[in-house]
From Swiss-Prot:
Has multiple catalytic activities. Apart from catalyzing the oxidation of (+)-tartrate to oxaloglycolate, also converts meso-tartrate to D-glycerate and catalyzes the oxidative decarboxylation of D-malate to pyruvate. It comes from the Bacteria. SUPFAM superfamilies: Isocitrate/Isopropylmalate dehydrogenase-like. One of its GO terms (molecular function) is tartrate dehydrogenase activity. InterPro entries: ICDH/IPMDH, IsoCit/isopropylmalate_DH_CS, IsoPropMal-DH-like_dom, TTC_DH. Pathway: Carbohydrate acid metabolism; tartrate degradation; 2-hydroxy-3-oxosuccinate from L-tartrate: step 1/1; Carbohydrate acid metabolism; tartrate degradation; 2-hydroxy-3-oxosuccinate from meso-tartrate: step 1/1; Carbohydrate acid metabolism; tartrate degradation; D-glycerate from L-tartrate: step 1/1. Induction: By tartrate. It catalyses: tartrate + NAD(+) = 2-hydroxy-3-oxosuccinate + NADH + H(+); (2R,3S)-tartrate + NAD(+) = 2-hydroxy-3-oxosuccinate + NADH + H(+); (2R,3R)-tartrate + NAD(+) = 2-hydroxy-3-oxosuccinate + NADH + H(+); (2R,3R)-tartrate + H(+) = (R)-glycerate + CO2. This is Probable tartrate dehydrogenase/decarboxylase TtuC. Its cofactor is Mg(2+); Mn(2+); K(+). GO terms for cellular component: cytoplasm. Its main location: cytoplasm.
């Protein structure tokens, strides 16, 4: 019996709802597979913890997480706590503290979900966006001076290192090489940002020589938004900076139907530390407690987690179950359905178990 230790951090808003659904699905997979076991410990860190203790997580938070094989994260952010506090107090310290430098965000149109793009079906939009996750625009360097005065100044410094850019570029090329189309698009803004972005272009060309079987091109980030919208079938694997990929991956999720189906993995490729898996969507306080949060993104990122742990069969079984459920029309309101979180979760669990309840659920 293979055993794994998972740290669950539901955090804010709908985070607890979707993480609970994700853990239920993982339990169904355990029962179906019978050859692995997941042991979960839940941490109550987040905005409520901040209101009580003045910090989003304790000072020894990273030390507590080191013993786990992976981290299952919900969402962070609260209306009454500044966003920079919630982000820099919890999610980013984990990503940067554990050197999870590869943020991997797959996107595709799932069966049964109608995307906003005309004449675009499941086979036309199937991407993986690789986001540099350790430096760049989110390096945390900068400052403010003369606060409150007319001459107040704020600086936000983007830092790009040869080591950081090279390793994410190599990761992206390897990923593109492993995918059927072997296509990679490198995204920068090197016409206007003439230092770090030009270095990105140069390093991309250098790393490309190691992967002669990968066809690659480069795009300016503004032009990339147009290409993603008008010519989605021309793209496959995409690599971009921390900020650019953050924005592009949200666009990708929307083009595929909803951020509610968009997953992400924060990976330490060298496996020195636990990697973290989370849905892309935010805490969504507007629907918190209503029971209608879409759990599909959490299920998909659970599949990413299983694959990272080496449980590829279980990951494939989970995604097959998800696609059976969406194709049957069991969908939450954000993707045009009437089902709630519980109904989608139960349908996926039934699909994993091989139950025939799907048709009944779709007809209700």
């Amino acid at each position: 019996m293979r055993e794994y230790k998972i740290a669950a951090i539901p955090a804010d808003g709908i985070g607890p709802e979707v993480i609970a659904a994700g853990l239920q699905v993982l339990e169904a997979l355990e029962q179906r597979s019978g050859d692995f076991k997941i042991h979960t410990e839940t941490f109550d860190w987040g905005s409520d913890y901040y209101k009580k203790h003045g910090v989003m997580m304790p000072a020894d938070g990273l030390d507590k997480l080191k013993k786990f094989d992976a981290i299952f994260f919900g969402a962070v952010g609260a209306p009454d706590v500044p966003d920079h506090i919630t982000l820099w107090g919890l999610r980013l310290p984990i990503c940067q503290g554990f050197d999870q430098y590869a943020n991997v965000r797959p996107t595709k149109i799932l069966p049964g979900i109608t995307p906003p793009l005309r004449n675009c079906g499941p086979g036309d939009l199937d991407w993986v966006i690789v986001r540099e996750n350790s430096e760049g625009e989110y390096s945390g360097h900068g400052g403010r001076a003369h606060r409150g005065l007319p001459e107040e100044v704020g600086t936000e410094v983007a830092i790009f290192t040869r080591v950081g850019v090279t390793r994410i570029m190599r990761y992206a090329f390897k990923l593109a090489q492993a995918r059927p189309r072997k296509l990679l698009t490198v995204v920068t803004k090197s016409n206007a940002q003439r230092h770090g972005m030009v270095m990105w272009d140069e390093i991309a060309a250098e790393v490309a020589t190691e992967f002669p079987d990968v066809t690659w091109d480069k795009m300016l980030v503004d032009a990339m938004t147009v290409r993603m919208t008008l010519k989605p079938e021309t793209l496959d694997t995409i690599v971009a900076t921390n900020l650019h990929a953050d924005i592009l991956s949200d666009l990708a999720g929307a083009l595929a139907g909803s951020l509610g189906v968009a997953p992400t993995a924060n990976i330490d490729p060298e496996r020195r530390f636990p990697s973290m898996f989370e849905p892309i969507h935010g805490s969504a306080f507007d629907i918190t407690g209503k029971g209608i949060a879409n759990p599909i993104a959490t299920f998909w990122t659970a599949a990413q987690m299983l694959e990272h742990l080496g449980e590829r069969d279980a990951a494939a079984r989970l995604m097959s179950a998800v696609e059976r459920v969406t194709e049957a029309g069991i969908l939450t309101p954000d993707v045009g359905g009437t089902a709630n979180t519980r109904q989608v979760t139960e349908a996926v669990c039934n699909a994993i178990a091989g139950s025939n309840i799907l048709k009944m659920a779709a007809a209700e």
